[in-house]
């Protein structure tokens, strides 16, 4: 029986997601044994600065992809939102399982909603996308950077001078946190989710026909189509973590509905469009073209310059 080595980051969430995929493959009757190999990524090592300063997309996947390309591992389970828009040659996304809740959530002291937080409230996030949209909605709050895993952030909220933090609903759900900890689910109208948020990407080598055949059985077609539209938009905008970019697609009656957003880090400049179509990639490209015409491309270049990228 073939042994499949699965690469994973060391965080509890990453290992939980990896083990979920392994158990699903076993449930489907995949003729493999599995072994998990923990890999430390650059994003795990550098915790004292914002993600945008460390170097954007790929921070949590590059080392893992290197292991896959050199034969150290056979597959890996990633959070889709950590995936760069373009994969290295020789690697493919073999499966996009059914998506979890895509929304961001607010966890606050006193269980207050975003609207009810007092003026000057300190909100913790490590995401420019979240901070830009929070500031657009509540220009009177203060954003303070926060890094670390879910447990670390919840502890910081309790013990440090944060009034609230924003997390992904999917991460909390996968880690088994109950709804009790959540003060408010942020509507995508208020905070458009990240491209790929709530979805997993199971990556493998392009030439591994046997493994790809089994991974394809885990694929959820609606999630995959939605994510393809979001990632096509991201690819066209050439945005990584350095720029507030958001994209969230749903498939309704066979049509892909994509909400796309580009904003300035302070939330004062915002471009947003909803595009509907049958072809996911075309929808993503169309959204990028519309936002670019309005000035989003210039904004991205300006923000990159200001950040020194």
UniProtKB/Swiss-Prot annotation:
It is an enzyme of class 2 (transferase). One of its GO terms (biological process) is protoporphyrinogen IX biosynthetic process. GO terms for cellular component: cytoplasm. Binds 1 dipyrromethane group covalently. Pathway: Porphyrin-containing compound metabolism; protoporphyrin-IX biosynthesis; coproporphyrinogen-III from 5-aminolevulinate: step 2/4. Gene3D superfamilies: Periplasmic binding protein-like II, Porphobilinogen deaminase, C-terminal domain. Its cofactor is dipyrromethane. One of its GO terms (molecular function) is hydroxymethylbilane synthase activity. SUPFAM superfamilies: Periplasmic binding protein-like II, Porphobilinogen deaminase (hydroxymethylbilane synthase), C-terminal domain. The keyword Transferase applies. It catalyses: 4 porphobilinogen + H2O = hydroxymethylbilane + 4 NH4(+). The modification S-(dipyrrolylmethanemethyl)cysteine is found at residue 241. Its EC number is 2.5.1.61. Keywords: Porphyrin biosynthesis, Transferase. Monomer. The porphobilinogen subunits are added to the dipyrromethane group. Tetrapolymerization of the monopyrrole PBG into the hydroxymethylbilane pre-uroporphyrinogen in several discrete steps. This is Porphobilinogen deaminase. The lineage of its organism: Bacteria, Bacillati, Bacillota, Bacilli, Bacillales.
